[in-house]
């Protein structure tokens, strides 16, 4: 379940985050989720290590940054063999949108390599790439 400290009171405009709101966030993004403070007023973003990726949505994100299309079965296999996968989602209770992605491979103890870092071009230049990398590095260190 989402820890109340991970989603602060600023996440919802109404003030404090209720238990029901935390349950909704948990159901949308999984237990390893946290708010990404947004430089864009009125929009909320969430990092998640546990929300499953829609492979087509992920490939659309990667193509939007200029990468060539890859077979979905290979993408699935790469995800399955990754040490860490992080999605950055534009929060919408009905339809969260993937706007950023990164994954890591490694031995889980000493070494890790970051791969496939992408931020939707609409959100580039707003600091989301730096926020994503900061989150990834922090998550790897906590493993």
Features from the language model and the residues they span:
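N-terminal mitochondrial targeting presequence
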Residues: 1-34
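Short amphipathic alpha-helix that is part of the acyltransferase structural core
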Residues: 22-73
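Alpha-helix N-capping/helix-start residues
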Residues: 52-55, 121, 130
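A conserved beta-strand-loop-helix scaffold within acyl/acetyltransferase catalytic domains
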Residues: 74-118
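Conserved acetyl-CoA pyrophosphate-binding loop and the N-cap/start of the following alpha-helix
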Residues: 123, 127-135
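Conserved GNAT acetyl-CoA-binding A-motif
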Residues: 133, 138-143
């Amino acid at each position: 379940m989402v820890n109340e400290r991970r989603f602060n009171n600023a996440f919802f405009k109404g003030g404090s985050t209720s238990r029901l709101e935390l349950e909704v966030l948990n159901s949308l993004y999984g237990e390893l989720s946290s708010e990404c403070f947004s430089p864009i007023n009125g929009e909320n973003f969430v990092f998640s290590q546990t929300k499953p990726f829609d492979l087509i949505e992920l490939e659309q994100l990667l193509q939007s940054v200029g990468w060539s299309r890859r077979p979905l079965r290979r993408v699935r296999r790469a995800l399955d063999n990754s040490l860490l996968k992080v999605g950055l989602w534009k929060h919408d209770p009905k339809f969260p949108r993937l706007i950023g992605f990164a994954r890591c491979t490694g031995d889980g103890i000493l070494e890790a390599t970051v791969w496939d870092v992408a931020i939707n071009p609409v959100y580039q230049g707003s600091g989301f790439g730096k926020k994503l990398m900061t989150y990834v590095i922090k998550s790897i260190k906590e493993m």
